[in-house]
């Protein structure tokens, strides 16, 4: 189970079939809300073709094993997480393509604040560019590459997800290359030019957001003005009637 892979925890005891039958969807939702602050914290990776009725039973068994464990988890209590953990799943599709995902989770030794998040974001932008150049553009057989760094403020840890699609027989080769690229970027760090490019991109995004918010605010204000002035509505209705038809 992914829970056993991503978290070093002793609460994943399998249930008997009669216990699974008693575990409802509402119970599963309650357990999920109790354990995880975000839906992104829980991931199901299904390898191969599984019938829907079997899949539901598997997920129910998974959540039920947490809910009915001998050591229940109190609400708000953090999970016992592995300090460094990675898992790789290769999933065959209808076409001869493999999806490869690798999770790495690290304990955060620095405060989780805005500065930390922006530094991680800047690093991930540079890393993602390295991965695209070295895996997708230079190494044949890889079709898409994505890199994502995220911070969990409650657990105070950092997780990194690397994912790409490639030819099934080459996923080990591509994964090795990806890890080499990440090690080089960690050693190199971020140059001043890369940091400036990141800052410019962030500023452009903020400018676009600010303009969008301003346009929305203007629309709301204009609507309120018309709402308070019935004459404005009457004038618009008269103009609509006078519009020519074709």
Which sequence ranges carry the predicted segments?
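Short amphipathic C-terminal alpha-helix that caps PH/PH-like domains
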Residues: 59-63, 123, 175-183
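Surface-exposed acidic, glycine-flexible loop patches that form ligand/cofactor-binding
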Residues: 33-36
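M16 family metallopeptidases and their MPP-like homologs
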Residues: 1-20, 39-47, 98-117, 132, ...
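Short, hydrophobic/aromatic alpha-helical segments in well-folded domains
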Residues: 16-19, 31, 58, 122, ...
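An aromatic/glycine/proline-enriched structural segment found at the starts
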Residues: 38, 43-108
